[in-house]
């Protein structure tokens, strides 16, 4: 039995849960709903409240589903959409490297999400 997909799901899902709860509740030093709405306004993503809630809920719920190995392809698809939006609206103009705020990190997350969606969640999952 391989534990690598469980580890990948737990780490990636946990990171997304953390980022989502930063947006929704201000946990872990995050901006909370008002700060996230302001960020969406600066990015010209309207309606900003809807965009902020959608991003936070997708990251939180998608991260939870991914960590549990439940509806893994759907969770990975939703989270990939969030990362593609982050690349397009925030990171692309900064080039590839993370040191300049580039798209390196979200791109790695997308690759990991697509790998999990394709290979499945593994034996230790609720999908099995």
Indicate where each model-derived feature is located.
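Conformational-control "hinges and anchors"
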Residues: 63
């Amino acid at each position: 039995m391989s534990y690598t997909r469980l580890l990948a799901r737990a780490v990636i899902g946990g990171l997304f849960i953390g980022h989502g709860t930063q947006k929704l509740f201000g946990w872990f030093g995050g901006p909370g709903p008002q700060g996230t709405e302001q960020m969406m306004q600066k990015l010209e993503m309207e309606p900003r409240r809807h965009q902020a809630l959608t991003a936070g809920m997708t990251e939180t719920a998608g991260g939870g589903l991914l960590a549990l190995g439940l509806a893994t392809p759907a969770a990975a698809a939703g989270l990939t959409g969030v990362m593609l939006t982050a690349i397009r609206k925030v990171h692309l103009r900064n080039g590839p490297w993370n040191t300049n705020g580039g798209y390196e990190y979200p791109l790695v997350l997308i690759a990991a999400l697509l790998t999990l969606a394709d290979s499945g969640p593994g034996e230790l999952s609720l999908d099995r």
